[in-house]
Amino acid sequence: MNTLPVVSLTASSSFKFFHFPSLHRSLSHSPNFSFTKSLILNPNHLSFKSTLNSLSPSQSQLYEEEDDEEEEEEDEDDDDEAADEYDNISDEIRNSDDDDDDEETEFSVDLPTESARERVEFRWQRVEKLRSLVRDFGVEMIDIDELISIYDFRIDKFQRLAIEAFLRGSSVVVSAPTSSGKTLIAEAAAVSTVAKGRRLFYTTPLKALSNQKFREFRETFGDDNVGLLTGDSAINKDAQIVIMTTEILRNMLYQSVGMASSGTGLFHVDAIVLDEVHYLSDISRGTVWEEIVIYCPKEVQLICLSATVANPDELAGWIGEIHGKTELVTSTRRPVPLTWYFSTKHSLLPLLDEKGINVNRKLSLNYLQLSASEARFRDDDDGYRKRRSKKRGGDTSYNNLVNVTDYPLSKNEINKIRRSQVPQISDTLWHLQGKNMLPAIWFIFNRRGCDAAVQYVENFQLLDDCEKSEVELALKKFRVLYPDAVRESAEKGLLRGIAAHHAGCLPLWKSFIEELFQRGLVKVVFATETLAAGINMPARTAVISSLSKKAGNERIELGPNELYQMAGRAGRRGIDEKGYTVLVQTAFEGAEECCKLVFAGVKPLVSQFTASYGMVLNLVAGSKVTRKSSGTEAGKVLQAGRSLEEAKKLVEKSFGNYVSSNVTVAAKQELAEIDNKIEILSSEISDEAIDKKSRKLLSARDYKEITVLKEELREEKRKRAEQRRRMELERFLALKPLLKGMEEGNLPFICLEFKDSEGREQSVPAVYLGHIDSFQGSKLQKMMSLDESFALNLIEDELAADEPGKPNVKPSYYVALGSDNSWYLFTEKWVRTVYRTGFPNIALALGDALPREIMKNLLDKADMQWDKLAESELGSLWRLEGSLETWSWSLNVPVLSSLSDEDEVLHMSEEYDNAAQKYKEQRSKISRLKKKMSRSEGFREYKKILENANLTVEKMKRLKARSRRLINRLEQIEPSGWKDFMRISNVIHESRALDINTHLIFPLGETAAAIRGENELWLAMVLRNKALVDLKPPQLAGVCASLVSEGIKVRPWRDNNYIYEPSDTVVDMVNFLEDQRSSLIKLQEKHEVMIPCCLDVQFSGMVEAWASGLSWKEMMMECAMDEGDLARLLRRTIDLLAQIPKLPDIDPVLQRSAAAAADIMDRPPISELAG
């Protein structure tokens, strides 16, 4: 691994700019934050405020609507929420003193007097000048000073340090807050790369963001030097700078993993920018970012731009280990300081106190309780006043109330107070306008709430006459260009500076709103959280309507990362001196809950690496089968494929494996330290050590007396141990035939008992299946015969060796299914008792197998990953997690309290009773001997020695418990991704897409490897079906829509509206495909693969109608779908149709039909213009 310096801009460092800790150590961020108490202005009273208050609902009502969850899908391939940059707010708030000086303490922007267009042209001229210098004098002309000279302002230190690292040839990881200027680093790298005549790829997670970067880079570098590649756009793809989505780059890298081959799209590429690299934590798309880092040729420099995260050092360490020399640059300082506010019905106050470390006293729950108590005090009857007066010495003033809570408010009263403090939207907007805190992005977590909010406040006039005229003109131009994209219901609010922005709007309309907002012509945008996704739309204020949101039928709380992501929209660099984030009182959360989340801090990046059909096929496929041979072996075209071992090495390079390997190293180091400590402590309590201490502390006479008693006590304890062992063996001998005899007939319930790793007694009821010998030929028996850890030793019964009829014994293993849906493998040692009752071993239905056989077969299907729970000389106790199929059986195992003692069938022999009686007598003898010792002269000093020894024993127990937990953790760690990879490989093998042994790829596999989608194998199966050839283009579009409609919904509040029904041909085709889908699902379930196979005809009629030529107005007339949802479905369908002509081994007739359908459908207002 490359251990490289970590560059961290902090105030605590003794060196001004550099730290050099290990990459594995967490960085200590000490940002600068100057807390400024906001001046509270008296807003101008609005004449219509009382009317608005009567019309406007509380904000909490906007997100409490039933069945109104937000669909967070912006593009067909980019349909997950974006994880934007967020800053370490909690650290900033706690650090209210501005320690730094010089350049670090402020950001200086010297804005020239030219217009924005003139400045961009001037920068473009400077870029061309640098290119000319390099052509004339060589690449030595490129240095940090030349690069930063193209800018009209002084750049920040973290930007300089990152650019210098890039110029040294390192890959760079940059972690910094939102709007801090990370894009400038990528831009400088692009200038350097272009000047050398080489190429740079810039990747983003969203097509909308790619389009935005495309426009920005063309303004700086010129149209000829910048290209665009997304799922449905290819503009100037051979340009020196190419903007693309991450999936496009990943697909390029599949062609030649680890090589910058001239035969791939990476020819002449020197650098790749991974923007928004914190998407690596995205549960559905994070794998793509990891794949790019893993597959990228090592000679290509990576520039990874990330939001503020908790573990940037781990990210940089991982990239350094698998890709090469990597440097980390971090900054936690926001260029525009952020102040947190809290909105209630009657006020808008700073959320925090003046020190920035606690909630503002006037917002605390105690303050609200005090206010309510004062009101109750004034209103109560005279008797209550007298009681209060007597307790307080006759003084009933408010000052005395401050110091007492004799009658605290109940929970219901507190909730009532909270509800009374919930502001209406107009209340908060009125305060924002009065305090000059606009423009604002107002986050509401469902689209219906956003639209309703616009209507509730559309009587506010936030624009002056000049601004209103500009909006009218812009709206007029937009209507001429895109008449169908105008949102008529939003026009009134728009002319007053108010708009909504969410996934239910058309992309063209959203772009129009974004443009107006950037121009300052929209003052408030009510938006869902998708707007926090990296689009260049900063505001002065971000309002967050709630700390929780609906997900299905339940409410879920926002995480700190989500909060910071939205808060990061506040504060416009070069425009605002500070930004504001306003949190709002709701019926569910108050200021104190808000503070907890603000101080929670950001969470670390977590690997979401999972295998897919496309990954397996592209990594493993070798020679391929074709219909027409071209000279070699008939029907085959030879091509090198990777072995499973080679593929495994690639998969095991994931970020998750890197982090877990660090955990493994740290755990093994800690285990070694624990073993060393236990060894030292053991020596301190050995007989020799205690004897040595006794000689030192006791007199000769006392030492002799104590020693004699100790020897007697030791001998009696030895006898007690013998009796205990005799009891165990007698119990062992009683259990063995009992368990053996219960392997036929009904399945009895038993109780297993053991101590867990913390030393706590655990009892588990279970249903008994039988002795391990009854599992003849099973996977379990084979595993146990090969694994030495399951070996059992013969137990020599020395006490009974001379007695006739007392043979030597050996423990046996048995199997049971616990009530906790876990399999247990155990010996007689762990059985507490056996019960008469159990499962009747009778078939549940005619022809079914018996329950015992069913459960044995279920166990045989398991992965055999057993965990050891406890061990002894009489054998160990093992546990294996059950499956969904065993869960229903485990539900029938009763709890122990429902089983009576009378139901027990374990009865002990006379020999056991005799041994138990002798054991009891021996314990009494030991007790008497201890009392005798306690009365001896030297016992007081000796007791101190024993107490210290006992403390040491307890410490050793804790260390051993920690050791067991670490060992269990290490046993659970396995390479992430590989198990899924092999499961998917098995599905591919059985479906005849790829022979996993010979790496021979079949036509089905070729198609699946080339296609883009959630389940590539399923899409390939459908598109290769000959039945599709006879479909007309609109019908084919309808069938394709059924494959990509996941997540699209009708809106439940549109009861009287409708959607177009699909034609009978489309319905019949979808029904025909259902059998094929069911077969694939069964195959996936067999191999535990859980990748959805979408097939839903519900919206096919809408797509078929659009492909048949219906106008947008006809489509949307009384439509039960939001226009944004319909547009997204149509674009997904177009994307799939556009792939078909490029896929291998697809019928040419189908390819022509797909191309025709895509061409017909790609028309306004859903067509997307890139430039």
From Swiss-Prot:
InterPro entries: DEAD/DEAH_box_helicase_dom, Helicase_ATP-bd, Helicase_C-like, P-loop_NTPase, RNA-DNA_Helicase, Ski2/MTR4_C. Coiled coil: none annotated. It catalyses: ATP + H2O = ADP + phosphate + H(+). The keyword DNA damage does not apply. It comes from the Eukaryota. Gene3D superfamilies: 1.10.3380.30, P-loop containing nucleotide triphosphate hydrolases. The keyword Nucleotide-binding applies. GO terms for molecular function: ATP binding; ATP hydrolysis activity; mRNA binding; RNA binding; RNA helicase activity. Residues 1-58 form a transit peptide. It is an enzyme of class 3 (hydrolase). Residues 163-327 form the Helicase ATP-binding domain. A motif (DEVH box) lies at residues 275-278. Its EC number is 3.6.4.13. RNA helicase involved in group II intron splicing. Essential protein required during embryogenesis. Involved in post-transcriptional gene silencing. Modulates the determination of cell fate. Necessary for normal plasmodesmata (PD) development and aperture regulation. Belongs to the DExH box helicase family. This is DExH-box ATP-dependent RNA helicase DExH15 chloroplastic. The gene is ISE2.
